């Protein structure tokens, strides 16, 4: 009644009951139709599943968030807590062990910029050429530029947006 409609019931013993609900509605115009945006791509693909990411992050909470996002993409995550450990891990492991490094900038012992420069100087060119993405609280345009100048391939500002992390990682893994 509130919608100026009616309900009609028609019943035939032994055959069943038919309910009819009538509600007067206006047809939506083309401009009124809300088009739902579908994601451009799925983040978990056979191509990405099992790829290994080296996460250099000293903050446990930030590491936990990053690990959750990356593992949700089907990626395998190894974590180190500073730049010294990151460079050492890259030196110790065979080339191709990792597909990408997600690097914090402000870490103890060696910051992300110095770690990136040390990795870029490794003798093994495959190791030296690994994609490195900055994941940092340094969110200004000058910080983004500095990350690229120091040899990084991408920049993600904290607090992280999961969709941006996924898109940046996928782009770097191509």
Where are these regions (language model features)?
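C-terminal compact regulatory domains
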Residues: 1-174
């Amino acid at each position: 009644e509130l919608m100026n409609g009616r309900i009609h019931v028609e019943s035939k013993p032994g055959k069943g009951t038919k309910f009819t609900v009538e509600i007067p509605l206006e047809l939506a115009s083309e401009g009124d139709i809300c088009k739902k945006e579908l994601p451009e791509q799925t983040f978990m693909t056979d191509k990405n599943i099992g790829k290994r990411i080296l996460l250099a992050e000293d903050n446990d909470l930030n590491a936990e968030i990053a690990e959750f996002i990356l593992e949700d993409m089907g990626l395998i995550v190894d974590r180190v807590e500073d730049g010294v450990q990151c460079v050492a891990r890259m030196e110790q492991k065979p080339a191709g062990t990792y597909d990408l490094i997600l690097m914090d900038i402000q870490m103890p012992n060696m910051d992300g910029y110095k770690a990136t420069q040390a990795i870029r100087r490794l003798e093994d060119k495959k190791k030296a050429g690994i994609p490195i993405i900055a994941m940092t609280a340094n969110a200004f345009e000058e910080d983004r530029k500095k990350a690229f100048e120091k040899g990084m391939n991408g920049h993600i500002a904290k607090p992280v947006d999961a969709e941006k992390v996924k898109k940046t990682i996928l782009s770097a893994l191509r």
